[in-house]
C-alpha cells in the first residue's frame, strides 16, 4: 500500500479508532497516534488565532494549507450528517419516519450536579476521546437489596437509584449537544479528574466492584451426577460418605465434602470418532491395549463406593463383629412402608473376622424378639446360593445403636455388599435419570424373578415383603437381585405356622411378581390411562407389548391365593424360548469380560520388571553393569528421531520390556556420548537378575 508520509502524520491511526491503541506506535507506524482528532486540533488552532488581535500572513497561509489537507482527507468527521426530508414523501408510512432533531441523544449524567458553564479545564475531556463511560447505569438484579448503598451515597447523587446515579432523563435535543461539543472543543486537552465526565468516586466504584464479586453465583459441576454443591478435594484426605440427617458428624462431613468427584478421565481418553484415524487391519492403537474407558470408570466408581468412609459420626464404632459403619441409604426415610411401626436404615460395614464388606440393615424397635426362635429359618436362608438373590450372612439383635438409653432392641441382618446398586424404584420411576421400560426388559425381569422364587420355594421358604420395587436392586446392566430376604420370617414369626400357611405365602410371592411387573408395564401408558379399570386392554391398545407378555402378567395378577393352585415349574417351561436371549447376552458379556482380563493379564509381569529396574538404577554401587542398565533405560525412554524430537511411543516401550522379560537372543545397540555397546536381551536379563540377587543378599 502506497502511503503519503506528508499527510499520514496528520491522519489518526485506524488502530486507535478500532482498538483504542496501536501496537506499532513506536515501531514505525506513519499515522498519528494523538487521541485528539486532527479536526479538533485545527478548530482549536483557528479559535486561538481568532482570539489574537494581529493576524500574520504566515498564520493565514498555515490555515489555508490545513484547509487543503482536510479537503484531501478520505473521511471528514466535521461533515454534517445526512438528514432525509420527509415532507415530500407521499406514502402512508411517511409519518412514521422521525426527524433528526426529534431523535433522543444519549447524554451520560453525573451523580454530582455541575454548573452550566465549564470553568476549569481540568474537569473536561473531549467526548470523542472517552473509551468507557463509568456513569452508565449498570444492571442491578432485583433479588438483591442495595438500600444501604443508596442511603450512604444519597448526598452524592440521586438517592432513588441503587448506585447513586441521578435518575434525571437522559434525553437532550440536538442543539444542546452541539453547544456542549463547541464548549468542549474550545477547551485544551487536559488530564481528567477522577470525578470528571460522570466518573464514580473511588469509594463508589469500590462498592460496585465488591457487589459484583460477592454476588456471583456459584458454578455447578458438569462432570457430578446428583448436582450437589461440593468442595474441591485435597490430596490425602478421606472421601466422606453419606451422613444421616441430624447426626453429630453431619456438619463436619459437610465441611470436608469434596466439591468434585474423582477425576476418572485422568487416563488418556479415547479421541472422538470424528478425529479417529482409520487403521489398517494389521495396525492397532494404544486404546485397544488396555481396558475400555467406560468399563474402567464403571469399576472405579464401584471401588470408590467400597472405600467410602465416614468420620465424626454418632454411629457406634463396633456392632458385634462389624465396624466402620457408613450409611448408604439414599432415601433417608427411616420409617418403613413394608414393616409397619418399624424404622429401617442400611449401612455399609467391615467384618472384623474376614475383612470383607457387607451390608447391615438395621430395624428398630424389635423388643418383641426375646429368644432365638424367630431366627430358626436363617440357616436355610444362608444356604441359598442363587444369582438373583442377595446372600444373607448373619442376623442378630443388639442395643449398640441407642447406648442403652431408650432400651429399644435393634434387629441387624447382614447381607452381601454390591456397591452402587439401586432399587428398581429408583431405576425406573423416581431416579434422576430413569431407564425406559420395554418388552425385552420385562421378559428379562420376569425370568430372573421366577428363578429367584423357585430357589426360595425349594427351601420351603417364602420371599414375602422382598418382592417389591424398593427391595429389588439392580447390580449391573439388566441384572436384578432380591434383597432384604428373611426379614419377614423374623418379624412375622409364628410358632403354630403350618405347611398350608407357607403354601399360601408362596402363592402370594407369585402374585407379587405379577404386581411388580405390572407397575413397570403401566409406565408405558400415558398418565391419564394408568388408573384404568381394564388396564390389560389399555396395554394392548396403547403400547407395543405383545399379547403373550400381557397374558402372562394377567395370569400372575389374577391368581387366587386363597384356594388356587399354580404350577411354577410348568410356568417356567413356557418361558424357555425367552430364556435363550438372556443366555446369549450373558455369554457375550462373559466373553467380553474374559477378553478384557486377557488384555490385562501381563500387566503384573511388566510392573515387576519395571520395579526391579528402578531398584537397580537407584542403587549406590558404581559398576559396569549399572552403566549398561542405565543405557538400556535411555534406549527405551530417551530416544530421539532424525528431527531431534523425542520419541514417545508406548508400543516401543512394551515391545522392549517384553523382549527383556523373555530374554531373547536379539541384539541391540546401546549408545552413549562416548561409547556404544552391542548386547543381547538375554545377556541384559542375566545382568539384571544377577545384580538384583546380589542386592537382596
Swiss-Prot record:
Entries under SMART domains matching the protein: S_TKc
Any single GO CC term annotated in Swiss-Prot or TrEMBL for this entry: P-body
Gene from which this protein is expressed: PAN3
SUPFAM superfamilies the UniProt entry points to: Protein kinase-like (PK-like) (SSF56112)
Binding-site positions, ATP: 361, 416-423, 470-471
Official protein name in the record: PAN2-PAN3 deadenylation complex subunit PAN3
Domain observations: The N-terminal zinc finger binds to poly(A) RNA. Contains a pseudokinase domain. The protein kinase domain is predicted to be catalytically inactive because some of the residues important for catalytic activity are substituted and it lacks the equivalent of the binding site for a peptide substrate. However, it has retained an ATP-binding site and ATP-binding is required for mRNA degradation, stimulating the activity of the PAN2 nuclease in vitro.
Annotated segments matching region Pseudokinase domain: 308-576
Subcellular location per the Swiss-Prot or TrEMBL entry: Cytoplasm
Amino acid at each position: 500500500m502506497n502511503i503519503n508520509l506528508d499527510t499520514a502524520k496528520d491522519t489518526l491511526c485506524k488502530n486507535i479508532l478500532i482498538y483504542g491503541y496501536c501496537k506499532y506506535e513506536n515501531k514505525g507506524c506513519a499515522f498519528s497516534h494523538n487521541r485528539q482528532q486532527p479536526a479538533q486540533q485545527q478548530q482549536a488552532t483557528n479559535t486561538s488565532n481568532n482570539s489574537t488581535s494581529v493576524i500574520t500572513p504566515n498564520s493565514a497561509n498555515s490555515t489555508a494549507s490545513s484547509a487543503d489537507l482536510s479537503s484531501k482527507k478520505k473521511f471528514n468527521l466535521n461533515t454534517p450528517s445526512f438528514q432525509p426530508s420527509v415532507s415530500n414523501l407521499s406514502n402512508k408510512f411517511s409519518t412514521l419516519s422521525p426527524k433528526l432533531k426529534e431523535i433522543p441523544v444519549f447524554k451520560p449524567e453525573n451523580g454530582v450536579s455541575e454548573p452550566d458553564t465549564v470553568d476549569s479545564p481540568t474537569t473536561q475531556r473531549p467526548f470523542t476521546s472517552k473509551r468507557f463511560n463509568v456513569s452508565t447505569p449498570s444492571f442491578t438484579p432485583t433479588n438483591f437489596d442495595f438500600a444501604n448503598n443508596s442511603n450512604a451515597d444519597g448526598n452524592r447523587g440521586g438517592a432513588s437509584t441503587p448506585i447513586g446515579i441521578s435518575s434525571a432523563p437522559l434525553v437532550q435535543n440536538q442543539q444542546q449537544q452541539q453547544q456542549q461539543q463547541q464548549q468542549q472543543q474550545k477547551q485544551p486537552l487536559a488530564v481528567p479528574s477522577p470525578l470528571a465526565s460522570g466518573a464514580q468516586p473511588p469509594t463508589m466504584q469500590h462498592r460496585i466492584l465488591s457487589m459484583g464479586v460477592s454476588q456471583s453465583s456459584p458454578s455447578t459441576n458438569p462432570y457430578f451426577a446428583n448436582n450437589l454443591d461440593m468442595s474441591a478435594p485435597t490430596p490425602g484426605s478421606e472421601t466422606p460418605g453419606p451422613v444421616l440427617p441430624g447426626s453429630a458428624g453431619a456438619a463436619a462431613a459437610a465441611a470436608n465434602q469434596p466439591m468434585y468427584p474423582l477425576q476418572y478421565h485422568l487416563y488418556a481418553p479415547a479421541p472422538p470418532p470424528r478425529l479417529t484415524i482409520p487403521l489398517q487391519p494389521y495396525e492397532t492403537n494404544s486404546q485397544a491395549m488396555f481396558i475400555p474407558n467406560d468399563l474402567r470408570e464403571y469399576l472405579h466408581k464401584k471401588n470408590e463406593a467400597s472405600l467410602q468412609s465416614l468420620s465424626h459420626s454418632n454411629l457406634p464404632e463396633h456392632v458385634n463383629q462389624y465396624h466402620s459403619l457408613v450409611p448408604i441409604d439414599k432415601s433417608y426415610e427411616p420409617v418403613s412402608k413394608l414393616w409397619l411401626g418399624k424404622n429401617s436404615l442400611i449401612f455399609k460395614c467391615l467384618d472384623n473376622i474376614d475383612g470383607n464388606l457387607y451390608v447391615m440393615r438395621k430395624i428398630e424397635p424389635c423388643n418383641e424378639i426375646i429368644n432365638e426362635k424367630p431366627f430358626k429359618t436363617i440357616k436355610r436362608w444362608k444356604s441359598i446360593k442363587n444369582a438373583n438373590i442377595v446372600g444373607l450372612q448373619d442376623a442378630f439383635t443388639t442395643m449398640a445403636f441407642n447406648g442403652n438409653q431408650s432400651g429399644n432392641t435393634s434387629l441387624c441382618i447382614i447381607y452381601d455388599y454390591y456397591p452402587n446398586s439401586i432399587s428398581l424404584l429408583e431405576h425406573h420411576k423416581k431416579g434422576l435419570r430413569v431407564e425406559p421400560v420395554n418388552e425385552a426388559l420385562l421378559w428379562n425381569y420376569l425370568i430372573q424373578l421366577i428363578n429367584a422364587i423357585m430357589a426360595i420355594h425349594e427351601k420351603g421358604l417364602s420371599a414375602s415383603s422382598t418382592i417389591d420395587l424398593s427391595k429389588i436392586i439392580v447390580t449391573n446392566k439388566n441384572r436384578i437381585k432380591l434383597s432384604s430376604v428373611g426379614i419377614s420370617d423374623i418379624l412375622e414369626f409364628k410358632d403354630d405356622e403350618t405347611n398350608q400357611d407357607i403354601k399360601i405365602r408362596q402363592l402370594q410371592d407369585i402374585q407379587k411378581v405379577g404386581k411388580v411387573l405390572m407397575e413397570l408395564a403401566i409406565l408405558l401408558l400415558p398418565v391419564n390411562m394408568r388408573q384404568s379399570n381394564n388396564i390389560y386392554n389399555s396395554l394392548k391398545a396403547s403400547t407395543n407389548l405383545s399379547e403373550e407378555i400381557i397374558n402372562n402378567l394377567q395370569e400372575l395378577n389374577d391368581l387366587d391365593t386363597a384356594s388356587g393352585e399354580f404350577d411354577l415349574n410348568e410356568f417356567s417351561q413356557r418361558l424357555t424360548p425367552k430364556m435363550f436371549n438372556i443366555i446369549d447376552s450373558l455369554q457375550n458379556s462373559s466373553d467380553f469380560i474374559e477378553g478384557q482380563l486377557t488384555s490385562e493379564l501381563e500387566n503384573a509381569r511388566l510392573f515387576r520388571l519395571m520395579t526391579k529396574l528402578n531398584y537397580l538404577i537407584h542403587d549406590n554401587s558404581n559398576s559396569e553393569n549399572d552403566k549398561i542398565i542405565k543405557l538400556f533405560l535411555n534406549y527405551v525412554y530417551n530416544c530421539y528421531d532424525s528431527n531431534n524430537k523425542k520419541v514417545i511411543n508406548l508400543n516401543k516401550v512394551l515391545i522392549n520390556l517384553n523382549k527383556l522379560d523373555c530374554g531373547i537372543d536379539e541384539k541391540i545397540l546401546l549408545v552413549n556420548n562416548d561409547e556404544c555397546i552391542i548386547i543381547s536381551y538375554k545377556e541384559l536379563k542375566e545382568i539384571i537378575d544377577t545384580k538384583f540377587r546380589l542386592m537382596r543378599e
